[in-house]
C-alpha cells in the first residue's frame, strides 16, 4: 500500500506489510491486477489536507494520482476508486477514458450530505 502521509502508514487499524510513503504510485515499478484508491476528492481552492482535498472541482489531485497509477495497472487490470457527488466525478471518469481505461460506476451509497461512488476503470 502507499500513502503520501507517513504518520497514516505507521498508524493503521489493520497492519500490513510492504507500505511505501509516496505520491500515488510514483515509487513503484511493478504492475498490478487491481489497484484500489480512496481519492482525495473534495473540491477545494487550496490543498490543506492531502487526505481529502482534491483541488479545483475535486479533480486536480485525483488527476495526478491517475497519472501516477496508470503505469502500474496491468493490461486487463482494474483501478477501483472512491469519489463523491461533491466532486465532479464524471470528469474523473472521462479522464480515465482519455487514458484508455473503460470506466463504470459499480456502487453508490447515500450519506448525510453526499453520495459516495465507487468507480471501476479497466485497462
Show where each model-derived region lies.
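Conserved SAM/SAH cofactor-binding pocket of Class I
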Residues: 1-37, 43-44
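Conserved Class I SAM-dependent methyltransferase catalytic core
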Residues: 61-120
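Mobile active-site "lid"/loop adjacent to the S-adenosyl-L-methionine
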Residues: 39-64
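Active-site-adjacent beta-strand anchor residues
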Residues: 2, 55, 82
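Short amphipathic alpha-helical segments
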Residues: 13-14, 47-50, 92-94
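Short, well-ordered secondary-structure micro-motifs
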Residues: 30-32, 47, 92, 116
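Short, hinge-like loop/turn segments at secondary-structure boundaries
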Residues: 36-38, 97-98
Amino acid at each position: 500500500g502507499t500513502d503520501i502521509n507517513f504518520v497514516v502508514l505507521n498508524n493503521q487499524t489493520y497492519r500490513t506489510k510492504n507500505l511505501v510513503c509516496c505520491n500515488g504510485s510514483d515509487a513503484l515499478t511493478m504492475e498490478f491486477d487491481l489497484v484500489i484508491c480512496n481519492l482525495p476528492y473534495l473540491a477545494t481552492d487550496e490543498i490543506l489536507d492531502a487526505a481529502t482535498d482534491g483541488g479545483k472541482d475535486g479533480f486536480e489531485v485525483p488527476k495526478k494520482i491517475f497519472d501516477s497509477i496508470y503505469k502500474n495497472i496491468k493490461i486487463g487490470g482494474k483501478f477501483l476508486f472512491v469519489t463523491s457527488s461533491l466532486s465532479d466525478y464524471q470528469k474523473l471518469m472521462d479522464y480515465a477514458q482519455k487514458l484508455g481505461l473503460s470506466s463504470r460506476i459499480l456502487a453508490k451509497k447515500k450519506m448525510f450530505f453526499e453520495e459516495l461512488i465507487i468507480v471501476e476503470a479497466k485497462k
